[in-house]
Regions:
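ALDH superfamily catalytic-core signature
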Residues: 18, 22-26, 104, 130-135, ...
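Short, structured coil segments at secondary-structure junctions
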Residues: 105, 160, 179-180, 268-269
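Conserved small-residue-rich beta-alpha loop and adjacent elements
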Residues: 52, 60-131, 136, 173, ...
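N-terminal Rossmann-like NAD(P)+-binding subdomain of aldehyde/semialdehyde dehydrogenases
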Residues: 1-74
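C-terminal segments
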Residues: 15-18, 25, 32, 49, ...
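A structured beta-alpha segment of the ubiquitous adenosine-cofactor-binding alpha/beta core
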Residues: 71-76, 143-161
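Short, well-ordered beta-strand elements within core beta-sheets of diverse protein domains
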Residues: 2-5, 226-234, 248-253
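Short hydrophobic alpha-helical runs that function as membrane-insertion/retention elements
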Residues: 108-112, 165-166, 184-186, 193, ...
Length: 313
């Protein structure tokens, strides 16, 4: 699990580009692996349009490594963290984006899960990415996948892990935080908190019920009926419960009241808020800054020019 240095002369943007080309060229094989996971009731049908969206997003990123910012009396430089441990549920989209972002930022990444969800699909995708790494003479162990029953020993004893990402609901996040002696960054991706005052579009209700992970809060007196919905007296109670229980990722409100919409937006504590709309299922939000440590350099501008040739913002 040791962190491997990557040659500074390697064009990581080209590595990422080649990785996406490799994935697209192997589309038929990936589909076959995906069908095995689906047949085993151990996965979802992969949408290659989502993978193309990740490609477009990453290709727009200019090489952020060693980027220098002029911050008044000091200069701040991006440097790689080392090894990032990502504890997640096996979602292939997360694996692709996080693996390639770790390469882009010159980090190594260990994916850890206590379930083998999407196992055939994920293993094949990692093999394809590792093939590209070897083409550039980069250690293929830069990206690893581990299955463990418990995270405690991994997180409490490893001195080679520099940061932990955890993707899951609030309870899962808390479990990892307790077990870890390392800095933990939490993501509540694809966990939605929904408050319904009223909703007229039947198609939205049908789509809402297809969301994998959501808590639905319905205002008292509503004619709507959902399995396992939570009844609340008003918007204040809904916001209070959401803020207490939320994983912090996304919340949704359905209402025809401008006041309620505004009140919800201003008071609910989630990163993404949808008003009378549903997410598209690909709201990945892995901030690239989380893959770096910031180094402060204190010196005169003249010396900074010598160090970086005036190439800083």
């Amino acid at each position: 699990m040791a962190y491997m240095d990557m040659n500074d002369n390697i064009d990581v943007s080209q590595v990422i580009k080649d990785a996406f080309i490799k994935l697209m060229d192997a589309k038929d094989d990936i589909i076959k692996a995906n069908k095995i996971d689906i047949k085993n009731n151990n996965g979802f049908k992969l949408d290659f349009n989502f993978i193309k969206d990740i490609d477009k997003k990453l290709m727009c990123i200019k090489n952020p490594y060693k980027k220098v910012e002029n911050d008044c009396d000091k200069f701040i430089i991006n440097d790689s963290l080392g090894t990032i441990c990502t504890i997640y549920n096996g979602n292939t989209y997360y694996l692709i984006e996080l693996a390639l972002k770790s390469i882009l930022t010159r980090n190594s990444m260990i994916f850890v899960s206590n379930v083998d969800y999407m196992d055939f699909t994920n293993r094949l995708i990692l093999i394809l990415i590792k093939d590209v790494l070897e083409k550039y003479e980069i250690d293929k162990n830069l990206i690893q996948l581990l299955y463990v029953n418990e995270f405690d020993s991994l997180l409490s004893n490893s001195v080679s892990i520099n940061r932990v990402f955890v993707i899951g609901d609030r309870g899962f996040q808390h479990k990892v935080k307790i077990a870890s002696d390392i800095d933990v960054i939490t993501f509540g991706i694809n966990h939605y908190d929904v408050y319904i005052e009223n909703i007229d579009d039947v198609s939205l209700i049908e789509k809402l019920l297809k969301l994998d992970y959501c808590d639905i809060y319905v205002k008292t007196g509503s004619d709507l009926q959902f399995d396992d919905f939570i009844e609340v007296q008003d918007i204040d109670e809904a916001i209070c419960q959401i803020n207490f229980n939320t994983s912090g990722f996304s919340s949704i409100i359905f209402t025809d009241s401008g006041y309620s919409a505004s009140y919800f937006v201003n008071n609910v504590k989630t990163n993404n808020i949808y008003v009378n709309m549903l997410p598209n299922g690909m709201d990945l939000d892995f901030d690239l800054n989380l893959f770096f440590k910031k180094k402060k350099i204190i010196c005169h501008d003249v010396m900074m020019d010598k160090l970086f040739g005036g190439s800083y913002e």
